[in-house]
Amino acid sequence: MRRVLLKISGERLAARGVSVHDAEVIGMLARGIKRVHEMGIQVCLVIGGGNIYRGSSGIPNIDRATGDYMGMLATVINALALQGAINNLGVVSRVQSAIPMRSICEPYVRQKAISHMEKNRIVIFAAGTGNPFFTTDTAAVLRSVEMGCDVMLKGTLVDGIYSDDPRTNINAERITKLSYTDVLSKKLRVLDSSAVSIARDNGMPVVIFSLDSEMAFYEVINKQGNYSTIEGE
């Protein structure tokens, strides 16, 4: 495996119900990312913004496009927070934003991002696709394809895809492998339909796992632990 993209939800950066950012959690994520980076694998990241603002369910009476732009700005804050933690470990990283903010971070340039990774730097993609009405999951799959990644991994609070919500149904069963068509036809909410369609059309495998420990990213890269894979028709 040469190059991978890890999607991290904004909620994962926060202590549950306590704060917008949890320094211990962010440090744990950074150490886990460094561990994979030290394997010689090129790593890029997409960060969500749901711990700060979620466009689809934010302030009432704000139109969807404006809310989505607010969510994109939230992802930039999260990207800078994670960049600081990664750099503090002695690993060089760069933030690239789909919405240019030149005094804060680099604008997104595909070839420059690839060049950074080839120079052993971690690249953090912020501001989603730069367009409203597209989720950060869609941005993650899009960047995975653009970067020529071998796989897109989505780190969540649940260790894979289940037949039902495992938090409310103790009999829910984890599904280890699904096709893109399965996810679309069953309307599974693990990824939005745009993200699944892009992955399917470009043959990008997607792995869903729980990013609950420093070792989680490392383990799933080495095909250890619990996870679900989406690939194949």
Curated annotation (Swiss-Prot):
EC number: 2.7.4.22
Regulation of its function: Inhibited by UTP.
UniProt-recorded Gene Ontology molecular function terms: ATP binding; UMP kinase activity
Binding site for UMP: G49, D68, T129, G130, N131, P132, F133, F134, T135, T136
Main subcellular localisation: cytoplasm
Keyword Transferase: yes
UniProt keyword Glycosyltransferase, yes or no: no
Pathway(s): Pyrimidine metabolism; CTP biosynthesis via de novo pathway; UDP from UMP (UMPK route): step 1/1
Classification via Gene3D superfamilies: Acetylglutamate kinase-like
Single GO cellular component term: cytosol
Any single GO BP term: 'de novo' CTP biosynthetic process
Record-listed ATP binding positions: K7, I8, S9, G10, G50, R54, T156, Y162, D165
Keywords, alphabetical: ATP-binding, Cytoplasm, Kinase, Nucleotide-binding, Pyrimidine biosynthesis, Transferase
UniProt-annotated location(s): Cytoplasm
Listed CDD domains: AAK_UMPK-PyrH-Ec (cd04254)
Reaction(s) this enzyme catalyzes, per UniProt: UMP + ATP = UDP + ADP
Reported function: Catalyzes the reversible phosphorylation of UMP to UDP.
Subunit and interaction comment: Homohexamer.
NCBIfam families the UniProt entry points to: pyrH_bact
Family: Belongs to the UMP kinase family.
Protein name from the UniProt record: Uridylate kinase
Organism of origin: Neorickettsia sennetsu (strain ATCC VR-367 / Miyayama)
